[in-house]
């Protein structure tokens, strides 16, 4: 070996200093932050408790599991101590977008890691932005340590499923963090037992040093779980590690082992250089780290002091730190005699040798406070040191006194300057440097040298913003309720005195640039801490959008001359924005260095520099334009931004042009004037007044122009103009240097041409809207490179407005969203010329004065951000506030749900199930006559309906009856679980209710006289009252803090009278039903407190059946009614809707306590679920002693229309419609349909089992039902075995519903049938004819009253589907009614008789606008517009279209008013469609539209007028314009001919027919608009194939009869529509029936198929177009 290579490997490479920039911590005793950890340390708290005697142990573990293992082991009771969490670690599954099944399948340690990782990332200021910084998610690593599993990896002992692998494989610990936070760097899960944390951190440091990642999150987790806990305790005890008396006792003489603990700790790290550069707050800096195996040669787990010394010396050497500079050691300190001895000896040998007496080494260990958290212990120790750095204090060692020191350690303390302190003291050191030790039982151990971070982040002497102006602030959350809570957290935090010490600029930086962005947000601007508090208290508008919404785009328009003059060097932006300042300085430097602009023309330089500076500022903030439009002078700056001209050349040309104007045009008497009048009108006047020689100088917009001429000519023109158009606006522009864009600049053109020829012009790099050409010029357009372009631009008319219109038109044609507009200049005059789309922004970027610069720009920035533009707030702050650093902010308020994955074996806890029996048991029947007083106190939707609390009382009484004699001893309490409402029970004279118990179970059902119909089901349990009260007490600590909002001024306080007046729209409560005396509703509307003295009153027994004398239903009502009140008085309920109890979830009541208390205080809270269609909440009640005595958890209330609820009660059906294996098909059952039903049954069975559902609702997507990625794989494997013919196609879409999945899996195309819903429990296969079967609800007129199982309003007549009494098909109209227009043209005002006989349900139905007819999210929604009769009821009979279908009634239907015109209706319905998309379909920006007859006409008009909204059109037998030559009176004759009824709804419909017919004929612009605009969306036409044969001759034109009687309508329609819209017509399809019979039962199937085919053809074309 060559000499120069010897021992090179022994050299220690330099250690890259690693900054800890974020931390998240969890520990026993409620430790959830550095603050709570510090409180534990300085107050000498111990969180150890004996397992056997603590209720927390009883809640989590099965005592019998411990008893079986430890029976006979000495000191087992003392050994079984631990430092456990107060509550099971929970999960906010909604925040992490997890299904219930997926959340249930996760290891509890994974759940804990997700939340602690979120807090560590928030603490570090990680926002998830892919910005190329060290925090870019693509280079972010994850390193996690653990030592235990929640479930032992033997699947025989557990209920294994698709998630078993996820639960048991430790790799998923780090993988879950990567997945949920989108981190794509290295990922690793390690296990070195107790030293896991420091090992994980070491791995992360090495990866950072080598460049494998640029940021990392690392640490450990440990939770003692019900499954693994007993056996792990037993094994550790047998190994001799557990202390015989309880808590860890580091360094003490009575220490015999350690006490187990739980915890989690994660730190976020970067290279120190990156952290300093990126403005991070640095908690500490890791200077050196060494991991070694230190096992004794004799025994793997026996510590070895000599080996530890080697590792510690190596860590110190790597750090480059003088050992004497290390002043504190956070020792591993397990409290074992050998372990403490080995560790202290190593510390003395490395750190205490040659140490001065006045520089003692302080040693401590937090295990005396929190125990040993095993794999998480290292991060616990690290967190303690960081807390010490922040406070510059050293906490006392728990339970320490010099007299208690372990005698074996005394020689080391006598010989070396080393100490343990018993009182808190200052940490006095010039540089605070510490060592953290962390050892593992496997022999793996490590030491870390860490230095305080303040050394690298000095707070003193920092720069502050140069001007005292407002700064931006943003708060966001995943949902509205959480956002409100977070706002209050910020308000409380900002009021704290310590927060006032934090610079406002740091707070702004942290809130905008260093936080996750969520869908619900607010943004404000404030210039002080208290101003920010005030702005937040004022409840700024909430933005509801998607965090992943499609980014919006912006276009810049540049101001011309003539506005307010602003010197950019005087602007507040010049002192605030570095990018603005640099750009402005560059312009002045270039101009002045070459004398490009004369002093007399400095205003031009100022305007140019201002606009160029604004552009550079916006670009530096991440706002980059997609198009540039300059108005006159402004086009020079636009060309510079587009790369056509350089700054120098643009200034040179502007300087030359200005000099030429001064030299040649000052004596030319040209002036300019602005005219507010349509361009066409101005052109007419110019044509008439040619003699005045007034010229059109600028086309600003369609309604604004600028003209030029001599003063005399302009005055003459003005006078003549105002004669013609008195309303025209005229404004003389006196501040212009010349009359540009007119003959008055002709003298300068020759010289200016020479100047332009000398300038080098480059291809454009951006879209430019040319004012010269009046059109959009794409990137690289050669016309902009012509040297005479700017010469012509100076002389010819500037067509700015025409260019804008051309750009907007091309965006429509390309189906490109219109951008927002930002004016670059000192005013907002130019953007006023732009006509925006409905939601387009038009914003100025600078005020009219220099002092308004920053305020205007900031306001525009925040409005752009709120609208969805991508703003790089890091760059914003770097530009305006480069000294800003990240700082502490309130953490996100998660809504946690506890859960441990259960073992399959039964838990042998104290039995609460009912006595065993092998027979079905019944309680005595309770007749409805006894229930009547209860029902009369509960009237819903006009019906006396049995309240759910009566069912609860019946079941509790039954549980008491069925309980065994041993269970009935002492004071009892009752639990009901899985409590579901199946159907309501209404008062009948001979009715009854009865509780039935299934054999060998605790399952109870309430049945009634209605053929033993089941009304409600639940599982019942009986338990000791004291046991129940102890378990309920756990919730009290979480609930009581919310009591504070009762005293806030923003809380609504309602007394009984007002409360029940608000509640009456849903439920009318009788005197005994009004159990709430007072209600406090929180500001967020999602939580409330109630107060009730009903339990203490004498009325609790009044009207109660004898069977329920010990279980008063109204007494139970007093503790749960609040949840229904809260939901039904919230903003989530609209008029005509109600929240109705669907499931009561789990109910626990100490009934005796409820009878004894004088009053109850009730707390209720809820959240919206299932896409806003239901509320899910909890309600708890406290007695007069403050004890929690009842709980209703997971109460689900479905939201529905009142009229639907009424019909459901009528039919005795459950509110939620669920699917069974029942199908609507042809009465002639074919073999393929039998095959379909067989496959359907199997598919539904697989889904039910996989999703753990008893039924599959049709109105929810599979994703909403819990079909996540892993479940989809599981289901897919099973389905491939069932349907091998579809293996190559099988992709299960979570966005689809059951119908779409069945269609995918059937072996042949979907048959001509539709799935309907049923509430029956039996699974039958039936085939039902759509038209004739009585199983499908049919109206008297033959139109189904349900579609896809969704009930439609009773007696829903459709004009085109009604039948006359003799069975002949009705015409599209109704006969004359009193007060209704007649066929002869006479008319009167609508009479009250028109609505007198219409049912409330029908009035409710026609007032619901728009109406959801079918619901199937995913594909583009279909909007169907009413026919000539004004209703959309015809569309209810359509079959399944596999998409959401929305119907629009005529808004004036109920008032007897028709449409004003086709044009007006198109505008009105477009607004309805936009609002529906925004509120209900945020993922869609367009709709497919269509309609029958008049509905098709309006649809075509909408397509012509609103191509940004309409994706395609399907017309249903709509007559092409100009084909049928009828007068309005003749049209009425045809439409009204077959009708003979005049009552009720028919009168309204008849009036609609007549009014709408006249409106259509009175406004013949329809054909012209269709032809001129050339409808630019795909169109598909359906035509009736049969002719119309009236029963008598009508006086009609010949061509009309030919159309009505011909079989060739489709041919004529195709030719006519083709002539009008050309290639956009994709097809014309004939449909059986004539115009008036297309939706009758005989023809509706064919109409459905044709409509569906047309929609598919349109979507295929749209997909092809991209």
UniProtKB/Swiss-Prot annotation:
GO BP annotations listed: fatty acid biosynthetic process; secondary metabolite biosynthetic process
Region (N-terminal hotdog fold): 905-1034
PROSITE patterns per the UniProt record, alphabetical: KS3_2, PHOSPHOPANTETHEINE, PKS_MFAS_DH
Enzyme class, first EC level, given as a word: transferase
Domain Ketosynthase family 3 (KS3): 15-452
EC number(s) stated in the UniProt entry for this protein: 2.3.1.-
SMART domains in the cross-refs: PKS_AT, PKS_KS
Alphabetical list of SUPFAM superfamilies matching this protein: ACP-like, alpha/beta-Hydrolases, FabD/lysophospholipase-like, Probable ACP-binding domain of malonyl-CoA ACP transacylase, Thiolase-like
Gene3D superfamilies in the record: 3.30.70.3290, 3.40.47.10, alpha/beta hydrolase (3.40.50.1820), Malonyl-Coenzyme A Acyl Carrier Protein, domain 2 (3.40.366.10), Polyketide synthase dehydratase (3.10.129.110)
Extra remark beyond the main annotation: PKS4 is part of a new class of atrochrysone carboxylic acid synthases (ACAS) with unusual domain architecture and illustrates how the biosynthesis of bioactive natural metabolites evolvedi ndependently in various groups of life.
Protein's UniProt name: Atrochrysone carboxylic acid synthase PKS4
